């Protein structure tokens, strides 16, 4: 049973703000695994604001560490995720001007698209979750998507 998951996005945010190579998200992932984390969460944003492609690939290759990769519904992001093969994918809404994720996916508008995306991950044995609003209707729609 998983007991501790750690989001390490802001390790990369600090690195990128400094314009340097440290702190390194890979080292952070290795460290939190060593001290007992069961899972690492990273968000590979379209604008690569924090975690970048190289970070994601390296972190997903750590043996014995489960990785939850947050991505948007952008086709390029879906392809990247299928290529690096995290254990889990969480599909999140993304707005370039937001500081952090501001709300859930628009499930009614994107139901068909989400179903196709979920099936792509399912076919590769990648478990998928959705970042949703806490409403009964979104819970019902999520369940219908599998």
Task: Label each PLM-derived region with a short phrase.
Residues 1-86, 144:
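Conserved N-terminal beta1-alpha1 strand-loop-helix module at the mouth
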Residues 76-77, 84-146:
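Conserved anion-binding
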């Amino acid at each position: 049973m998983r007991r501790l998951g750690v989001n390490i996005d802001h390790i990369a945010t600090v690195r990128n703000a400094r314009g340097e190579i440290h702190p390194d998200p890979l080292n952070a992932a290795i460290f939190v695994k060593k001290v007992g984390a069961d899972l690492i969460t990273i968000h590979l944003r379209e604008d690569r604001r924090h975690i970048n492609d190289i970070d994601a690939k390296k972190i997903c290759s750590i043996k014995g560490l489960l990785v939850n990769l947050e991505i948007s519904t952008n086709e390029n992001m879906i392809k990247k995720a299928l290529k690096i093969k995290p254990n889990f994918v969480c599909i999140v809404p993304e707005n370039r001007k937001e500081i952090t994720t501001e709300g859930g996916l628009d499930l009614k508008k994107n139901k068909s698209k989400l179903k196709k995306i979920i099936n792509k991950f399912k076919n590769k044995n990648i478990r998928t979750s959705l970042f949703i609003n806490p409403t009964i209707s979104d819970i019902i729609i999520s369940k219908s998507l599998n």
